[in-house]
Structure formats: C-alpha cells, structure tokens
C-alpha cells in the first residue's frame, strides 16, 4: 500500500503576470465519490480520489490552464477498445488461480487510462492551442538553475485490487526565467502491461506562448524481460524502456489582450 501524507495545503507563487496555485487536501468522502461516479456514468472511481486537489496556472487577465482529477476522469474512454479487452483477458489469465478469475470484464475502463492534457481557463479569453514544430529545450531544463518554487499534487490513485497501480499526478518547478510542469498518468497491471501518458508544459518568461508535449508509452510486461523487475514500480526508471505509441506537440498561444 502506498502511503501518502494527507495534510492539507494551499500554496501560491507569483511568476510575473502568472499566479501558480497548488491545492492539496484530503481524499474525497465516499458519498461524494459515489455521486461523481454516477454523474460520469462509471461504476466506481479510483479508490484514492482527490477531487479537490488542483494545480492551476492563471494569468492576471484570467486565461490559463489547470489540472484536476475530475476533468481527467471525464476523458477516460469507457467504451471497450480491443486493447482494453485483450489486456483484461491477460489480466484474468495472470490470476487464473484466483477465485475471481472468471469474472466478467467490466463495461468501463478499470485502468482509468486518461489522455488528459489539462483544462483551459478563462471566460472571454483562452489559450489558443495550435500544432507546432517547436520543442521543449530539454538541455536548458537540465542546466542547474535555482528552483524558486516546487510543488507536486496527487490527483488520483488506485491499486487495481492489489494487481498493480493506476495514478495521476502533476508537479511543477519554477526557475528564475521559466517554469516546467509534468502531468503523469502511470499504469502498471502486474504481469500484463505498463503504460505512461506524460504531458509536459514549458514557458519562458519572454515568450507569448507555452509549449505542451504529450507522449504516450506502453509495453507488455512480456516484452520487458531484459528490464530488472524492481524498475517496474519506478516510473522515472522504466520510462526509457517503453516504446512511444503517440506524441502530440502543441503551442498554447496567449490570447490578444483587449484594447
């Protein structure tokens, strides 16, 4: 069982015209979880659901982007794709000695896989999302710069009935002239597969846009026999061994200021 501190906190940091807010609070009450599950037409939600946790990046003009569990779960594809069914069948085979091995595949994505990339903020003005050939300068990110602000927020986590883990978390670090955010969905179904959906967001203070890069990686465990099993539980370590399934590169342009 993964242990997490549930101490509530509300951290704010100003970066030029941006206000960064990280709200961390307790797990949702079961009654609220049940109500939300009903609204989303899902039989159940992750066992650790932090529905009020949020990481928000908002400009003084009102536009911006935030990351929260509710919106992330809204884009979980609950129609059964072939990958999901095949995965569930393998999962059942992998626990054939279990009394539950004959259970019916549930009519929802029990892995909570989400390709969520954030929620755009603003009533009159919003960030304009366009495809781009520009890339986040990873070399610059490796340079040793002073960290002005750092926060990590867990959005949800589920241990898949002790057969792995599904989690979504977001962290941000602010340097003197830029900020970098990583939203990570990590899934491990023991004996079956590992999947990672990463969204990276980067902004330099003198630019009028953010760069957003989404990368989806996945591998069956059977194809990872060359990797030491202890790495299966370490997203940062296992990432390099997972083949890239999809990439999306976008520029989030700031809206024109009203005159």
From Swiss-Prot:
GO biological process, one term: TOR signaling
GO MF: protein phosphatase activator activity
Keyword GTP-binding: no
UniProtKB keywords: Cytoplasm
A Pfam family reported for this protein in Swiss-Prot or TrEMBL: TIP41
Compartments, record wording: Cytoplasm
Disulfides per UniProt: none
Any one Gene Ontology cellular component term annotated for this protein: cytosol
Family: Belongs to the TIP41 family.
Family annotation (PANTHER family): GAF/PUTATIVE CYTOSKELETAL PROTEIN, TIP41-LIKE PROTEIN
Known role: May be a regulator of serine/threonine-protein phosphatases 2A (PP2A) and 4 (PP4).
Protein name: TIP41-like protein
Species of origin: Xenopus laevis
Gene behind this protein: tiprl
């Amino acid at each position: 069982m993964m242990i997490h501190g549930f101490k509530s906190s509300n951290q704010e940091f100003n970066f030029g015209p941006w206000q960064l807010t990280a709200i961390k609070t307790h797990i949702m009450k079961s009654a609220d979880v049940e109500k939300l599950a009903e609204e989303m037409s899902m039989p159940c939600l992750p066992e650790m659901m932090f529905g009020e946790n949020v990481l928000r990046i908002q400009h003084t003009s009102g536009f911006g982007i935030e990351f929260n569990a509710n919106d992330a779960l809204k884009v979980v594809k609950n129609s059964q794709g072939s990958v999901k069914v095949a995965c569930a069948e393998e999962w059942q085979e992998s626990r054939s000695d279990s009394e539950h091995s004959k259970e019916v595949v549930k009519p929802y994505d029990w892995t909570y896989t989400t390709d969520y990339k954030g929620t755009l903020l603003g009533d009159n003005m919003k960030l304009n999302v366009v495809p781009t050939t520009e890339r986040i300068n990873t070399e610059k990110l490796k340079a040793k710069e002073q960290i002005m602000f750092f926060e990590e927020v867990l959005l949800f986590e589920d241990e898949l009935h002790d057969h792995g883990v599904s989690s979504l978390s977001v962290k941000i670090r602010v340097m003197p002239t830029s900020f970098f955010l990583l939203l990570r969905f990590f899934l491990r179904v023991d004996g079956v597969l590992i999947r990672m959906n990463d969204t990276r967001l980067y902004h330099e203070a003198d630019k009028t846009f953010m760069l957003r890069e989404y990368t989806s990686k996945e591998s069956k465990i059977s194809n990872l026999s060359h990797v030491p099993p202890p790495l299966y539980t370490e997203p940062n370590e296992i990432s390099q061994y997972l083949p890239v399934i999809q990439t999306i590169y976008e520029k989030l342009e700031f809206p024109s200021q009203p005159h």
